[in-house]
UniProtKB/Swiss-Prot annotation, chain A:
Keyword RNA-binding in annotation: no
Name of protein: Protein-serine O-palmitoleoyltransferase porcupine
Subunit architecture: Interacts with wg and Wnt5.
Gene that encodes the chain: por
The family this protein is said to belong to: Belongs to the membrane-bound acyltransferase family. Porcupine subfamily.
GO biological process terms, semicolon-separated: lipid modification; peptide hormone processing; protein localization; protein maturation; regulation of Wnt signaling pathway; Wnt protein secretion; Wnt signaling pathway
Protein role: Protein-serine O-palmitoleoyltransferase that acts as a key regulator of the Wnt signaling pathway by mediating the attachment of palmitoleate, a 16-carbon monounsaturated fatty acid (C16:1(9Z)), to Wnt proteins. Serine palmitoleoylation of Wnt proteins is required for efficient binding to frizzled receptors. Also facilitates the glycosylation of Wnt family members, including wg and Wnt5. The cotranslational disulfide bond formation of wg competes with the N-glycosylation. Porc stimulates the post-translational N-glycosylation by anchoring wg at the ER membrane, probably through acylation.
Organism annotation: Drosophila melanogaster (Fruit fly)
From Swiss-Prot, chain B:
Tissue note: Dynamic expression pattern during embryogenesis. Expression is predominantly segmented, with expression also seen in the limb primordia and presumptive gonads. In embryonic tracheal cells, expression is close to and dorsal to the tracheal placode.
Domain of life: Eukaryota
Lipid-linked residues (O-palmitoleoyl serine): S202
Name recorded for this polypeptide: Protein Wnt-2
Disulfide links within the chain: C65-C76, C115-C123, C125-C148, C196-C210, C198-C205, C281-C312, C297-C307, C311-C351, C327-C342, C329-C339, C334-C335
Organism: Drosophila melanogaster
Keyword Ribosomal protein (UniProt): no
Amino acid sequence: MDYQYFEEESDYIDLDEEEEDDDVVTAGSLDHRFGQPNGEEDYYFGGDDVEEELVVDGHGVLELAGRLLESLQSCVQPSVLQVMQYVAPMLLLCLLCRLLCLLYSQRRRLTSLAPLHLFHFACGLIILQITVGYRLLLLLLLAAVGYLLLQLLRLGRRGAQVLAVLTVGSQFLYELLIWRRRSDWPQLRGIQMVVNMKLISLGFDLTASGQLQARIPGPFAYLGYIYSPATCALGPWVSFGCYMDCLVPRNSWLVSLRRLLPNVVICVLAVTVSNCVAPALSDFFGDSSHFLVMYWDALSVRSSHYFVGMMAQALLVASDQRLDGATKESDMLGPLISQPWRIEWPRSISSLVRSWNIPMHEWLKRYIYAPCKPTASTSRGRILVVVLSTYLVSSLLHGMDLRIYLVLISLAFLAEGESLLRRQLASLLNACITANLCPGKERCRYSHCPSKRRLNSLSYWLARLTNLAFTALAIFHLAYLGVVLLGDDLEVGEDGDSFLWHWQQAGYLSHYIGLGTFVLYLFIS
Amino acid sequence: MWKIHNKLLIYILWIMEIRLVSSFTSVMLCGRIPGLTPGQRNMCREMPDALIALGEGHQLGAQECQHQFRGHRWNCSEVWQRNVFAHVIPTASREAAYTYAIASAGAAYAVTAACARGNISTCGCDVRHKATPTGGGTPDEPWKWGGCSADVDFGMRYARRFMDARELERDSRTLMNLHNNRAGRTLVKKMLRTDCKCHGVSGSCVMKTCWKSLPPFRLVGDRLMLKYQKAKTVQAVKGKRGLRLVLSRKKHAGTARAQKPVLDWPKRMELIYLEASPNYCERSLQTGSQGTSGRTCQRTGHGPQSCDLLCCGRGHNTQHIRRTTQCRCQFRWCCEVKCDECDESYEEFTCK
């Protein structure tokens, strides 16, 4: 026997239908009465509803823990599955590109490098097609513009500088041109940033001696370099020379597979922390401590960065692509893009800045900091200006994102102030409390070094405690600056001051600490 | 006797594993659970493992209703205990509107959560969020979705079929119940949260991961409580295709001209009721009122739980209670626990 209930359309009123009957027959024959609520009911329900909820603490904590586990459970599985759907095609295409290059290099005697570039370009195109879809056409258009800009290198060193200015400026131009569809830009911004860094580095490398000392790469080499599968989607920057050196893979497959596994595992852990664990802990401590909310939200930003870095490391390992400055290669993980252990427990702000993105740090040091730094009798003010210029260029590379500018310029002031203060304190107290790590026992030029003194010495523990205090301060700065980067940058236009809310809640404490650091440094010296 | 029978059935229902329920429930238990209509029994035989989720949803609604109406004259008792899967309120009142909405919301909530946990075999991941092999897609949907999101549409459909199957008549009360059922389960769907996270170079958005999650059911109850306080009075009028409910209008006695009445429909998310609520002071079987005699009230305080309001002016009894409890227990080696005895006394107020 089928149950009977009203059909879909008769359940609710159709708004389009107009009642034509003038005589509205009130259904008097119905068995239900209707009327107005009586006065007593109004007084009863309109009364004061403020009630004190006697929440038992144990029950509250258990409920919160249950809610935490439930939110984790509904978040971890979709996140890991979606991330695997991104990671697996990228890894397979990198391995395919490596296999094709290996077969080609073994088969013939390298009469031409063009097929190798084509393999890189084709696999990179497929990766970008999978990742960004139809926006790939926009990326190819920007690559063509970049190749035209590359012809400026015929002018020599000045052409390279003009190329750099035009490349960074065109980043802003792209954002303004597609402002109508600016929801597309956050997906392309990271990819185009790496392309711009490659263009600028190529320009400066080819004109290192002042003139164009080598031929401009052909279209195939250019496209293979720009859209190499290991670096096209998630970075990092590699120089053209490093790319050419690694066209033919050299490491054995066993080494690469052994390095792939820890990278993928850390990828999954990092995305779990970024998507699920850190926001859940931020909600958990939402009412107790504002610093803990800032810390967990900033940890969500940092673990997202670790996830991208580890994934890019996995792509580098799969492609057997090495990074510039080969001293920072780990035997377990391969080429290192970031060092999370030095970021989560930093010795100083400058050390964590160097560990954040090692290839980008290499790029900034090689093309911005080193040319601007004079060799003879460098003054303090000049170094400060050069450091600020380096941070400013790093901000400009990120395009039109005000939060990046605020965070990076603040980071520049905090890092430089801390470095100056610690160097001055180290000279005064003759102890190893500088921002950089002191060398070993023999080479340490201070008398109070942890490596020189024994464990029972007082100066050993004083130096350790001072460094520990600076580490705690750096952790606070990390939470303070990182929390601003949480959330979409498109929200800046809608709520003008929303991303500064955390800084206002903290009373701009990090900025005042940075100012106090400079004042203390000027007072001491 | 009747309650013992119900508890035995509930106990049997909860203690069985899914396999036993799948084979045994469809033959025996679906026919024995009281309160089910024939249509609901057919749905129980079709999908017996969803019945456990509906039982959980039933309890969710019952506990939430009793929590929200604690301290009120009508405290949502006796309504849920009469039958296992039924809730009957004779009066088409505002409280009935809340009861039907919270029951429907609980059913939709529990079935959706059971789908996400994988406890119901015929519903899986939300297929609309499956990732396609090619990442191109249409420009309208730029982000690739994957993984298991809460399949809320299955919960909505199943809860609607099950809860609406109770309405066998075609009168105004049925229309009211169907409307409030829909308001309750649609609220659960509206309160679903979609969280997304961007990952990319330097904070860009090369990759995006999204997931959906159910809010705590307490939030659903709180939201429905706001709608309960703003519930609308409706009346039944005869239309072209049968009865329909329109908002009741206040009559202006001073208006001499009899203008053409303009009919207003209740909004989809509003709770509606047909009759004014009784005062719930006296016990009455016709109105489903239990009365407030014997209820615990607060002498000092304001609000619906105060003795003046809760006892309807009949006064209250004061009972001095003195009891002895064990406190400051200590473990002594070896091996006994010794406690002190503490006396405490307090006053308890109950309505006359």
